[in-house]
Amino acid sequence: MNVINGKIDCKPIETGYDESRIEILNKRLAEMIDKKVIHGAAYCISHKGKVIAHGSIGRNNAAGIDTAMQPDTIFEIASVTKTFAATAIMQLVEDGYIRLNTKVGEILPQFAKKPFEDITLWHLLTHTSGLYPDGGCFPEAAPKSAWELVDAQAEKWDGKSDFDWISAGISGGLRRPVGAEWQYCSFGFAILGEVVTRVTGINVHDYIAEKILRPLKMSDSGFYPTAENAARCFYWNCEQKEFLEKVTSGEANGHYDEGTVWDNIPNTAGGLNSTVYDLVRYGNAFIYGGRFEDARILGRKSVEKMSTVQLSGVPDHCWTANEPNRLYGVGFDMRQGPAYSYSEGTIMHEGSGACSLDIDLKEELCAAWFVPFDEGANGWSAEPLYNVQNIIWSGLI
């Protein structure tokens, strides 16, 4: 199966990385494509601040059209977006506008009443707010997820009056007491996006572009496809392909939710588009104390805070887990265990569908990979995620 190579800064051996492991990575990705676990893959690996591997294999779509995935294919990074929301919050902490223990109700009045009045920004960032988690985390069917509650209210919206999506989303109350349990809550990161907008007076999408994406020269990243880059976007079906073609031609502007209530809800839980190369630039900023090349997005102490385990003795039962002590940083996952070979203290985040960004601060190794699931994944598979991570980290000499 043909592998397309992208731009690199140096050969792997120059940074102390075994190039033969990249051959194994390509071999295993090809096998996963043959088994229909994934449609294709794009990856980028940097070591000691230098890109040492950058490639792609397989198809750039899930519609069965035989066009190749490229190293610079743009894709939806899904929940990896949450780390950008967390970074924006930390920037406002650094600038003295908020603290991690600021109560959400001090900024958003919908939270300034029972049972939400004790929820802080920190609780949202660590998934311990007690708010109902994403659908599918637990078997019970009611109350509905925040997104379903918003959707139900949106159907009644007259299209003219202000739509209170926050009240709609939290109308189910709390599933657990504040701080008692780790429950994966994407809605909490939409709330964090709204906090950024309210505190700065700048739409959070624009804030992230101005304060994170542009300084790091993440030129292929943004919340919506544009006429300039839509032709490079991965698509899941022919309907999405047609929409992207309209964006390319100028018939559509890329804002797929324009004119709906969703256009007013921050897409900071999972709406960013990027490339593996751009994500590695972002990851390197954390490896080097909040700076990369000539950009500064955070101070060193903020990076240390975000990459320090925040929870102690907080259980996680999401998706049938039975973890008595969930390891989590500020907006970043810090899971450890027999499935992973990265260093203790590594920060990472997965995106559904799937992709992963793993940042090993000790080894100065950062990897981003996009592995869109095919039918053989049955909705989710560890093989293109955890197994690939182990292959990548095995190259360290």
Say what each PLM segment does.
Residues 24, 31-44, 64-124, 176-187, ...:
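Short active-site loop at a secondary-structure junction
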Residues 52, 64, 72, 84, ...:
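Short, well-structured active-site flanking segments
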Residues 307-317, 376-397:
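Short, gly/Ser/Thr-rich active-site loops of penicillin-recognizing serine hydrolases
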Residues 3-6, 13-77, 99, 167, ...:
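Short, conserved catalytic-motif segment at the N-terminal edge
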Residues 53, 357-358, 364-374:
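Short, well-ordered beta-strand elements
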Residues 341-347:
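Short, hydrophobic/aromatic-rich segments at coil-to-beta transitions
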Residues 2, 116-341:
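Short, surface-exposed loop or secondary-structure junction motifs
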Residues 39-41, 52, 203, 353-356:
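Short loop/turn microsegments at loop-to-beta-strand junctions
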